[in-house]
Amino acid sequence: MNERAIRQAWERFVDGGDEPLSVRSAVAGSWQRSKNFKISVESQAAPVLSEAELYRCRADSALLSATARPAMQRAAEILDDASSMLILTDGAGHIIETLGDRRTIEDGREVHLQDGGCWREDKIGTNAIGTALAAGKPVQIHASEHFCERVQKWTCAAAPIFHPIDHELLGVIDISGPPTTFSSQSLALAVSIAGNMEVLISQTIKNQHDRLMNFFREKQRRWASHDLLAIDRRGGIVHASPDALRKFSKHLSQSDTDLSYLRNLPFDHWPDDLSKRMVNMRTVLVTEGEDELGAIIVFPSGQKAPEPTAQKRRRHLPEASSIEHTNIR
């Protein structure tokens, strides 16, 4: 990589808008996007979330963080002596975890390469995190390939992490350090970690679906006269009794049968939201410990069944030791 030629191409681009023919197409495209976003090359640091905002981001990315932590900790042991840091972001480019060499982590604070920093291209220009998010594929950005001059003191390699079922871009795993740490192996390591995380996420989802199905089967035995539909925390249909899908489609227009919007809705808001869309139904929220597993939508079979008394409702609930929170409406 000819750092001097890249620096000269960057200077010509930011000074006169000359097409950067001597740089990689991924970098040239990102520079142009950064210019379109009106990013100043003199920007000193990325914006940073407040503590409350960072808390919400971490809560929203709980599945990602939980599955990432073991893989990140193993990789961080390697990077601890390599003057590099390992970074996890959410799907919006907010840094939610940092591990690795302590000095490198401390140096990262100068440009807000830290927990809460936002590294999308529209916030801080070309960088491995933001460009991987924009392109949806792994990318390595070295030194003068960064759009903002102060960030050119870094070399970074990032790989996106996708949800194994609906392929939503969940976040990015990034390896960053000073330019002297540049290695093509950094990108390979980032890709490997991202792949391992996707496997772990898939296993976690299967486990959650299994626990949701255990609850579904219990309700199916107790409410034999009702039709039941099980949906996971992202609004995906996991299982349904024979007539439940027909009733579900009858209640909703074709466009409304996509419940994926629920993934971004606070869990305790689900019953109210779903009751407005589907009359004469109830929603049972299913949690186990701190895991929000999903919900069971209960459709009456034939005439509407009478609302159970408080005593009967308690009998219908699972034991607190197995399901710590349910909400029947």
Place the predicted regions along the sequence by residue:
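Intrinsically disordered, low-complexity terminal regulatory regions
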Residues: 1-123, 130-140, 153, 162-165, ...
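C-terminal, active-site-flanking charged/polar segments
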Residues: 62, 230, 246, 285-288
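PAS-family sensory/regulatory modules and their coupling/dimerization elements
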Residues: 144-145, 154-159, 261-315
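A charged amphipathic helix-loop-strand protein-protein interaction module that recurs
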Residues: 66-72, 112-141, 194, 245-285
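Conserved adenine-nucleotide phosphate-binding loops and their immediately adjacent elements
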Residues: 47-58, 313-325
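Signal-transducing coiled-coil/dimerization helices and immediately adjacent hinge/linker segments
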Residues: 199-262, 315-329
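An active-site-proximal beta-strand-loop segment
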Residues: 148-150
